[in-house]
Design a protein with these regions (language model features):
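Cleavable N-terminal export/targeting peptides
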Residues: 1-65
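Transmembrane beta-strand segments of outer-membrane beta-barrel domains in Gram-negative
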Residues: 26-28, 44-71, 75-77, 164-295, ...
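Short loop/turn motifs that connect adjacent beta-strands in outer-membrane beta-barrel proteins
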Residues: 78-87, 115-121, 147-152, 198-199, ...
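Gram-negative/organellar outer-membrane beta-barrel architecture
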Residues: 81-91, 95-233, 238, 334, ...
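Sequence/structural signature of outer-membrane beta-barrel proteins
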Residues: 112-116, 129-135, 160-164, 209-213, ...
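Flexible, surface-exposed loop regions and adjacent strand-edge segments
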Residues: 171-176, 219-225, 276-278, 312-321, ...
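C-terminal outer-membrane beta-barrel translocator/porin domains of Gram-negative envelope proteins
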Residues: 248-352, 357
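C-terminal hydrophobic structural anchor segments
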Residues: 348-382
Length: 421
């Protein structure tokens, strides 16, 4: 009953406000339904050729805005199908929900523009959130393209006041060994990618993670054994490569995605200790059956400590990937360790022909080592069903409502905007 009540309240909130809280890490703006209609609200971020097939697709599809107009005679603000060099701004209140935050009240905003007529859409997305668990988050995410798409500038700034529990090291850790922590956190990531050929980009950047005022309420545990600190700084350079052939970054129907990041943290740049890591993110999207709107999505995410000894909060951890989407079925931070190996599959299918409702079933598996130099431990599964509600039929953006299950009785509701991967 509690789950049903939470879900009902959240869906009502999504329909009456702009659900941008979960979208903040997707690096792309989406159509919003302002509480008060605003001029020039952004309708989509995906440029679709104005062909007969595209027009027919639009005519046959229904999204949340169409339903609001049909049932409540609510007409969203005038929108446009393309983004020009003139920036488009949207600032709206929203609500969000995750296992680690519970309910959150959010003020979200985004800006979208093109540097040139043929350039990809550049975006700046931000939000300020206050959560039921007394957390404060302020992220600013930017994805800027040059006029000729030769360069891509990617920024990730975050300021958090973040009470959160840890459960020990390795994927053998016990959910009942919860250790409540509290800390403040600043992240500054700046990366520049240059076009190499086709869909391939490569480059580098500067990365810093700064944790301070770290406290915990646990007894003698893995955190104490690993080494408690009141602060930690990881500062260094990164080398990056990106290959992206997806037909739609928000809701891919075909294509693939591969990203590699090598990170080297150096003492002379202020790091608490020298260490390096490697992240390999690979995804594949397959129409199944071919020619349908159903998709089999596959994902592999490996986060590996190559050498050195990262501070406890800098170790790979569940849902601390770039978009906080690994490990549905578990709370953020449930598993932590020097090595993380993760895989997930999700089958996405249409329920109604008009595209308003769809469904998914997902299955994931993750394995962690404990401290550096130890072996990978047990494989922990996560699985569950999900519902998709079409928020924007042009960009194919969905409201994603999933219920995940994991080991040791772990379970919970997961709500996002835009597909998980």
């Amino acid at each position: 009953m509690k789950v049903f009540l939470r879900l009902s309240i959240f869906i009502i909130g999504l329909l009456l406000t702009a659900p941008l809280f979960a979208q903040q890490n997707k690096d792309v703006p989406i159509k919003v339904i302002p509480v008060k209609p605003k001029k020039d609200a952004l309708k989509d971020t995906i440029h679709i050729a104005d062909t007969l097939a595209a027009r027919k697709m639009r005519e046959n599809q229904i999204d949340v805005a169409d339903m609001l107009e049909a049932f409540f005679n609510y007409k969203p603000a005038t929108t446009v199908d393309t983004v020009t060099s003139k920036p488009t701004f949207t600032i709206v209140p929203a609500i969000g929900y995750t296992l680690v935050t519970k309910f959150a009240v959010v003020l979200s905003g985004n800006m979208a523009f093109r540097a040139g007529p043929k350039s990809r859409i550049s975006t700046i997305i931000t939000s300020i959130a206050f959560t039921q668990n007394k957390q404060f988050t302020f992220p600013v995410l930017s994805n800027i393209w040059s006029k000729d798409n030769k360069y891509n500038f990617i920024g990730d700034f975050r300021l958090y006041k973040y009470p959160q529990s840890t459960f020990g090291l390795g994927s053998n850790s016990n959910i009942h060994h919860e250790d409540p922590m509290d800390y403040s956190y600043v992240r500054i990531y700046e990366t520049v990618l240059r076009h190499v050929t086709g869909n391939l980009y490569a480059g580098g950047g500067y990365i810093i993670d700064d944790h301070w005022n770290i406290t915990d309420k646990g007894r003698y545990n893995d955190y104490a054994v690993y080494g408690k600190n009141s602060f930690s700084i990881a500062s260094g350079f990164s080398l990056n490569a990106l290959l992206d052939s997806r037909d739609n970054a928000i809701n891919p129907y075909k294509g693939g995605y591969a990203s590699v990041q090598y990170r080297d943290n150096l003492n002379f740049l202020g790091s608490s200790g020298g260490w390096s890591s490697l992240i390999i993110d690979v995804r594949r999207y397959i129409n199944l059956p071919e020619g349908s709107d159903n998709v089999l999505a596959l994902w592999s995410y490996d986060w590996l400590t190559l050498n050195g000894r990262p501070a406890y909060l800098d170790l790979p951890s569940t849902q601390w990937d770039a978009f906080s989407t690994t490990g549905r079925g578990y709370i953020q931070g449930r598993f932590r360790g020097a090595q993380m190996v993760y895989a997930e599959g999700e089958y996405r299918y249409r329920i109604f022909d008009n595209g308003l409702l769809g469904g998914v079933f997902f299955l994931n598996a993750e394995s962690f080592s404990a401290a550096p130099g130890t072996k990978l431990q047990a494989i922990q599964p996560g699985y569950g069903p999900g519902l998709r509600i079409k928020l924007n039929k042009i960009s194919k953006t969905n409201i994603c409502i999933d219920y995940g299950f994991g080991s040791q009785g772990s379970k919970g509701l997961f709500i996002d905007v835009g597909e998980i991967f």
